[in-house]
Amino acid sequence: FLIIRRPIVLGLL
């Protein structure tokens, strides 16, 4: 879950 959430945050940045 956290692993999937990390890429999403980086993508927004």
UniProtKB/Swiss-Prot annotation:
<dbReference type="GO" id="GO:0090729">
    <property type="term" value="F:toxin activity"/>
</dbReference>
<keyword id="KW-0391">Immunity</keyword>
<comment type="function">
    <text>Mast cell degranulating peptide. Shows antimicrobial activity against the Gram-negative bacteria E.coli ATCC 25922 (MIC=30 ug/ml), the Gram-positive bacteria S.aureus ATCC 2592 (MIC=10 ug/ml) and the fungus C.albicans ATCC 2002 (MIC=12.5 ug/ml). Has little hemolytic activity. Its mast cell degranulation activity may be related to the activation of G-protein coupled receptors in mast cells as well as interaction with other proteins located in cell endosomal membranes in the mast cells.</text>
</comment>
<dbReference type="GO" id="GO:0005576">
    <property type="term" value="C:extracellular region"/>
</dbReference>
<protein>
    <recommendedName>
        <fullName>Vespid chemotactic peptide 5g</fullName>
    </recommendedName>
</protein>
<keyword id="KW-0964">Secreted</keyword>
<keyword id="KW-0044">Antibiotic</keyword>
<comment type="similarity">
    <text>Belongs to the MCD family. Crabrolin subfamily.</text>
</comment>
<keyword id="KW-0295">Fungicide</keyword>
<dbReference type="GO" id="GO:0042742">
    <property type="term" value="P:defense response to bacterium"/>
</dbReference>
<dbReference type="GO" id="GO:0045087">
    <property type="term" value="P:innate immune response"/>
</dbReference>
<keyword id="KW-0800">Toxin</keyword>
<keyword id="KW-0399">Innate immunity</keyword>
<keyword id="KW-0027">Amidation</keyword>
<dbReference type="GO" id="GO:0050832">
    <property type="term" value="P:defense response to fungus"/>
</dbReference>
<keyword id="KW-1213">G-protein coupled receptor impairing toxin</keyword>
<feature type="modified residue" description="Leucine amide">
    <location>
        <position position="13"/>
    </location>
</feature>
<dbReference type="GO" id="GO:0031640">
    <property type="term" value="P:killing of cells of another organism"/>
</dbReference>
<keyword id="KW-0467">Mast cell degranulation</keyword>
<keyword id="KW-0929">Antimicrobial</keyword>
